[in-house]
Swiss-Prot record:
<feature type="compositionally biased region" description="Basic and acidic residues">
    <location>
        <begin position="769"/>
        <end position="786"/>
    </location>
</feature>
<feature type="compositionally biased region" description="Acidic residues">
    <location>
        <begin position="260"/>
        <end position="277"/>
    </location>
</feature>
<dbReference type="InterPro" id="IPR014014">
    <property type="entry name" value="RNA_helicase_DEAD_Q_motif"/>
</dbReference>
<keyword id="KW-0378">Hydrolase</keyword>
<keyword id="KW-0347">Helicase</keyword>
<dbReference type="GO" id="GO:0003723">
    <property type="term" value="F:RNA binding"/>
</dbReference>
<protein>
    <recommendedName>
        <fullName>ATP-dependent RNA helicase drs1</fullName>
        <ecNumber>3.6.4.13</ecNumber>
    </recommendedName>
</protein>
<feature type="compositionally biased region" description="Acidic residues">
    <location>
        <begin position="172"/>
        <end position="185"/>
    </location>
</feature>
<dbReference type="GO" id="GO:0005829">
    <property type="term" value="C:cytosol"/>
</dbReference>
<dbReference type="GO" id="GO:0005730">
    <property type="term" value="C:nucleolus"/>
</dbReference>
<feature type="domain" description="Helicase C-terminal">
    <location>
        <begin position="537"/>
        <end position="714"/>
    </location>
</feature>
<feature type="compositionally biased region" description="Basic and acidic residues">
    <location>
        <begin position="130"/>
        <end position="145"/>
    </location>
</feature>
<keyword id="KW-0539">Nucleus</keyword>
<feature type="short sequence motif" description="DEAD box">
    <location>
        <begin position="455"/>
        <end position="458"/>
    </location>
</feature>
<dbReference type="InterPro" id="IPR000629">
    <property type="entry name" value="RNA-helicase_DEAD-box_CS"/>
</dbReference>
<comment type="subunit">
    <text>Associates with pre-ribosomal particles.</text>
</comment>
<dbReference type="InterPro" id="IPR011545">
    <property type="entry name" value="DEAD/DEAH_box_helicase_dom"/>
</dbReference>
Length: 820
């Protein structure tokens, strides 16, 4: 028995305790007997010197073990105290407790609000997270030119030049000024011939327009609101027409040709839905569930807890202050949890993002966790929308272990590849960057995708995205759940069938043409011949009417940039948002507008879809958009989530069709429509100010161009240096591939522009064609002849015709002489 005793001594001294189930007895013995009992045991088996060493080591271990055990014992004691505090009702309760199957009481409700009260975000809009700002700073490679800095620098130069003028010139200028004042006093009043001419041009028309517009304002106050000035003639009755025809001096009102065409188009569109198309829809869509009025009233009182969602999801919803689901969320969440395909549509600002994010998170909570795999792909048409959706999804998943990744253009490819190596659960991307990683990143596989979401699906189904969408759909698995959402969702079966939907459920909460009921729509009419005063109207509205939290939409990036410079010169704080800016600049513009550093956001249709910024009070359309659908998305940036807002459109005669469609849909819905009257003299004054700034605007543009060229030259230098230093590494990288050639890209871009603006816009642009040598020589000869360097040289035909003319002329002269 001696050998076992020798082995037990080192076991007690050198064995290190680990966390396991067998250590509970050891811990309890240590806590009950204390350090003295342990010292006695060690004294029997070790020397005095060893005793000191072991005592020091065991004391440090015992402290940690005691803390762990105390926490466990504390929890157990709490449970015992709670059990002891309950009233004893005899042995029957003990028998019932032993037979408990673990099910929750049906009346039990989670106190989600109190649990997440510390992290509640009031009015969360998907922006302002630190991740977005850090990502923009880290991944923004391009340093843009600061327009405000150029403007301030030029203004400082002008002030310095004025100060450098000698005092003599100042005295002379004062004398000249006094002389001019004397001359002006002789006339009695100053005469501005330019203003006089403008008033003379509009003299008769101005009075008529004013009466029409004042009549409209009276009609607006009485409750009958019109689309814009001039619509009274469209709504006149037959009796008025007969009375007008009886009087020779009054012309019978005639309907505008564009209105006639739009009415005919509308009737044709309504008649297009024939029996064949209806049969297609019945065969393609799943049958819709009929809800009674009582069930609809009950649904409006529902909360998120009644969807049987998991506690982490409910805590995430409470953290962003989502309490009651919106109509689209009430309809979508139960169907999406069943794994069915969905085609959803609701007005702007109704919570469509949360409608598909919440069921996705709920399903991912029950995923297998042994091997990380990417299961969800959410595709967005614009970068800003993808960044916003990423922020919303990560905020809702705060209390879960679900991982996310955003694949957006403008951010670092290397960092995105590193994140993809970890196989995140949800991928939020734009189509172009998604395809780039799909083809060129070895760590990214799409074979495991189970859910595909297309946000703003009607835009994704247009010709501009058709090729990219087809490439994605043919690569990812066909056995998936597909969900499509948009405010203006298409019903065309031919378009939807391309997505590969399997008997989708159609969830149309509102009509496709509806706007928010809290939105007031205004229209400012530009009379024929006053289209060049459009900027004057905009400056008047932004300077005197709508002074803060305004988004101004433009059709062209060039026009938005010029107006941005004009706003800076006039002292209006503005930021721009369009496709010519780097991703860092775009995110910075949105953040500055959101935080109130700037009052105006000048944007193209890039910001028309999905952008959710809290507190936007007004949307101004510098020009009416190309279609009514785009108009709905633009004005949907305000009056979101039950808040009120206002939209103002500056409309001329070419915009008549879109304005009429908007007014017609709003009246059918019962929304507020008004006509805003702007004094032409005020608009002319602001237009003249804008005209005076043209020279300064061009100078700022020229200086900006020079700075961009310098920045580009610096970038080329650094690129060349990197090529020299790291040539072997750069040349060893595999070349990135794309599914389409450059020619196919150009054709796809043209197809998208043709669908948006019409075929005429594409045909009107002159295509750049490479000239042959023969054509170049012909152009050079014509240029030289025009300059007068080389005279015109007769050709063979010209010489022969000239000879024939001389012969015929001689014969005629001989005949005349013979007659004489």
């Amino acid at each position: 028995m001696a050998p076992p005793k020798k082995r037990t001594a080192p076991k007690d001294d050198d064995f290190v305790l680990t966390l396991s189930d067998d250590e509970n007895d050891v811990f309890s013995g240590i806590n009950e007997d204390g350090d003295d009992h342990l010292d006695e045991e060690t004294a029997k088996s070790t020397t005095k010197k060893r005793k000191r060493d072991t005592a020091e080591t065991t004391q440090s271990k015992n402290k940690k073990q005691k803390q762990q055990k105390q926490s466990k014992n504390g929890k157990q004691q709490k449970k015992v105290e709670e059990a002891a505090s309950e009233p004893e009702e005899g042995s029957e309760e003990e028998e019932d407790a032993g037979e408990d199957d673990g099910a929750l009481n049906s009346d039990f409700e989670f106190d989600v609000g109190a649990a997440a009260q510390k992290d509640v975000v009031e009015g969360f809009d998907g922006w302002g997270l630190d991740e977005t700002k850090d990502g923009a700073k880290k991944n923004g490679d391009k340093q843009g030119v600061d327009i405000d800095e150029i403007i301030s620098r030029r203004q400082a130069k002008k002030e310095a030049q004025l100060k450098k003028k000698p005092k003599k010139q100042e005295v002379e200028s004062e004398d000249e000024g006094s002389g001019n004042e004397d001359d002006a006093s002789d006339g009695g009043m100053s005469v501005d011939f330019q203003d006089d001419e403008l008033m003379a041009e509009d003299g008769f028309g101005m009075g008529a327009d004013g009466e029409d517009e004042s009549g409209q304002s009276d009609a607006q106050e009485s409750g009958s609101e019109d689309e814009h000035a001039g619509s009274d003639s469209e709504d006149s009755d037959d009796d008025d027409d007969d009375a007008a025809s009886d009087n020779d001096s009054v012309a019978t009102p005639v309907q505008h040709p564009d209105d006639v065409a739009s009415d005919n188009d509308g009737s044709d569109i309504e008649s297009e839905v024939d029996a064949e198309e209806e049969a297609k829809r019945k065969a393609f869509f799943a049958p819709e569930e009929q809800t009674s009025e009582q069930s609809a009233a009950e649904l409006s009182k529902k909360s998120f807890q009644e969807f049987n969602l998991s506690r982490p999801i409910l805590r995430g919803l409470a953290a962003v202050n989502f309490t009651n689901p919106t109509p689209i969320q009430r309809k979508t969440i139960p169907v999406a949890l069943l794994g069915k395909d969905i085609v959803g549509s609701a007005v702007t600002g109704s919570g469509k993002t949360a409608a598909f994010v919440v069921p996705i998170l709920e399903r991912l909570l029950f995923r297998p966790r042994k091997v990380p795999t990417s299961r969800v792909a959410i595709l967005m048409p614009t970068r800003e929308l993808a960044v916003q959706c990423y922020n919303v999804a990560t905020k809702l998943a705060t209390y879960t272990d679900i991982t996310f990744c955003q694949l957006v253009g403008g951010f670092s490819l290397r960092e995105q590849e590193n994140i993809l190596k970890k196989r995140p659960d949800v991928i939020i991307a734009t189509p172009g960057r998604f395809i780039d990683h799909m083809r060129n990143s070895a760590s990214f596989t799409v074979d495991t995708l189970e859910i595909l979401v297309l946000d703003e699906a009607d835009r994704m189904l247009e010709d501009g995205f058709a090729d990219e969408l087809n490439e994605i759909l043919t690569t990812i698995p066909k056995s998936r759940q597909t969900m499509l959402f948009s405010a203006t969702m298409t019903d065309s079966v031919d378009k939807l069938i391309r997505v590969g939907l399997n008997r989708p459920v159609r969830l149309m909460v509102d009509s496709k043409k509806n706007t928010s009921m809290n939105l007031i729509q205004e229209f400012v009419r530009l009379r024929p011949g006053r289209e060049d005063k459009r900027l004057g109207y905009l400056l008047h509205l932004c300077k005197e009417v709508y002074t803060g939290r305004v988004i101004v939409f433009f059709r062209q990036k060039k026009e938005a940039h010029r107006v941005r410079i004009a706003f800076g010169l006039l002292g209006l704080k503005a930021a721009e948002l369009h496709g010519s800016m780097s991703q860092e600049q775009r995110i910075r513009s949105v953040e500055n507008f959101r935080e109130g550093k700037v009052s105006f956001l000048l944007a193209t249709d890039l910001a028309a879809r999905g952008l959710d910024i809290k507190g936007v009070e007004t949307v101004i359309n510098y020009e009416a958009p190309q279609s009514h659908e785009i108009y709905l998305h633009r004005v949907g940036r305000t009056a979101r989530a039950g808040r009120s807002g206002r939209a103002c459109t500056i409309a001329a005669e070419p915009d008549r069709k879109v304005v009429k469609a908007a007014v017609k849909a709003s009246k059918a819905q019962g929304a507020k429509v008004a006509s805003r009257v702007v004094d032409p003299a005020v608009a002319d004054r602001w237009a003249q100010k804008a005209k005076d700034l043209e020279e300064e605007i061009n100078a700022v543009l020229e200086e900006e161009k020079i700075e961009k060229q310098l920045a580009q030259a610096e970038m080329q230098v650094t690129r060349s240096e990197n090529m020299i230093k790291h040539e072997a590494e750069i040349m060893s990288r595999p070349k990135r591939t794309w599914f389409a050639s450059e020619r196919e890209k150009i054709l796809s871009k043209k197809a998208g522009a043709a669908e948006l603006n019409g075929l005429d816009s594409v045909k009107s642009k002159k295509e750049k064609v490479r000239l042959s040598n023969k054509d170049k020589k012909r152009l050079d000869d014509s240029r030289q002849r025009n300059e007068g360097n080389i005279g015109w040289k007769k050709g063979k035909v010209d010489r022969e015709s000239q000879k024939q003319g001389k012969i015929q002329k001689g014969k005629k002269e001989n005949k005349k002489k013979g007659k004489k």
